[in-house]
Amino acid sequence: MIFITGTDTGVGKTFVSKIIGKHLKYKENINTGYLKPIESGGIEDTATLKEALNLDENLNILNPVNLKNPLSPNIAAEIENKPIDLVEIKKSFDLLKNKYDFLIIEGAGGVAVPIKYNSFLMSDLIVYLGAPAIIVSRPDLGTINHTLLTIEHLRNKGILVKGVIINCINELDTVLHYEKTFETINRCGNVEIIGIVKNENEYNINFDKIIG
């Protein structure tokens, strides 16, 4: 299993999860499942992966905590008077982990987004589920700081960081010296860049690193 997290919201976690899931299921014939423990702002991410991987579970199994408002989970849960139940998340996790040979778990927002007001963060959910992590990052200016902070935060929680996948939301040609940016993340973060995604059909990802 792998936990797909990111340096921020909107960085492309769902997009990258879809690419990884489709490759593992349809090109490597690995029985691959998906779990989105918490989704704020609708059910679109979960529905996208359910369709892409042709999963037969109901959406409430794939996404046990669904919040209507596109806000931090702790805020959305408070506004909607809907306490986040870790037991329900664990039930879905156990069911899916036992059914599938490989489970993709996708986070919401970044690693330090609060799930509860008691300082239970998204990174604590990763620890709770016992999963290693992959960080989805972007190539643009500012990404070095965001990526290195994310790596440090995860490692301080004892989470194994398997690598970073760069999701090119913008064309790489428009990013100045992106090779040096990637090299800086690699060297300063002591982490492998295991993938670069240009679009849904053009990507270079070390899938062995993900499943190994």
UniProtKB/Swiss-Prot annotation:
Binding annotation for substrate: S40
Keyword annotations of the record: ATP-binding, Biotin biosynthesis, Cytoplasm, Ligase, Magnesium, Metal-binding, Nucleotide-binding
Active site residues per record: K36
Record family assignment: Belongs to the dethiobiotin synthetase family.
CDD domains in UniProt: DTBS
Residues annotated to bind Mg(2+): T14, D45, E106
The keyword NAD belongs to this UniProt entry's keyword annotation: no
Pathway recorded for this protein: Cofactor biosynthesis; biotin biosynthesis; biotin from 7,8-diaminononanoate: step 1/2
Co-factor(s): Mg(2+)
Protein name stated in the entry: ATP-dependent dethiobiotin synthetase BioD
Enzyme class: ligase
Gene3D superfamilies linked: P-loop containing nucleotide triphosphate hydrolases
Compartments where found: Cytoplasm
Role noted for this protein: Catalyzes a mechanistically unusual reaction, the ATP-dependent insertion of CO2 between the N7 and N8 nitrogen atoms of 7,8-diaminopelargonic acid (DAPA, also called 7,8-diammoniononanoate) to form a ureido ring.
Reaction equation(s) it catalyzes: (7R,8S)-7,8-diammoniononanoate + CO2 + ATP = (4R,5S)-dethiobiotin + ADP + phosphate + 3 H(+)
Annotated source species: Methanococcus aeolicus (strain ATCC BAA-1280 / DSM 17508 / OCM 812 / Nankai-3)
Subunit structure: Homodimer.
A GO-annotated cellular component: cytosol
Domain of life: Archaea
Binding site for ATP: G10, V11, G12, K13, T14, F15, D45, E106, G107, A108, G109, N167, C168
Molecular function via GO: ATP binding; dethiobiotin synthase activity; magnesium ion binding
